[in-house]
Amino acid sequence: MSCHKLSAPNADFAFALYKSLNAKAAAGKNIFFSPLGISTALSMLSTGARGETHSQLFSTLGYSGHDQAQINEAYQHLFQMLGYSHEDEQLDVGNAVAVRSGFTPLEKFLKDVKDFYAGDIFKVNVTRLEEAAAEINTFIANKTQD
């Protein structure tokens, strides 16, 4: 499935999310978020979800007319397209799943995150929140040339 099939549901999700965030924001405050980042994270999560959780994720993201394989292929196409840079342009995208130490996700989930979402997987100790946050922030800084 072409990444272009993600445009309408991702735009609808982005505007709904903005509307929700804006309703809760303090007056005069700016809202800064990455709709693509959030929809990608939830889509990666959906690869490992089943049952009601999967249905809720797909409904929220507007993917109800598609199956998981189609969504995975569309994101794979999107990240392949984003990976092509021109000499005077650069766009860095980084996806990752931070897994709680001691928890082992299913191998298929790990493979799908890597294959379809160009995602990295690393373990974090969630009992040490500051260290976990630092690891995640370091990953982001490295991916964004910060």
What are these regions, as identified by a protein language model?
Residues 30-35, 52-65, 108-118:
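Short alpha-helical "patches" and their helix-cap loops
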Residues 28, 68-146:
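Non-catalytic, conformational "gating/processing" segments within enzyme and secreted inhibitor domains
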Residues 34-39, 45-47, 60, 64-66, ...:
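Surface-exposed loop/turn and secondary-structure junction residues enriched for glycine/proline
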Residues 45-81:
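Active-site-surrounding "flap" and adjacent substrate/cofactor-binding loops of secreted or lumenal enzymes
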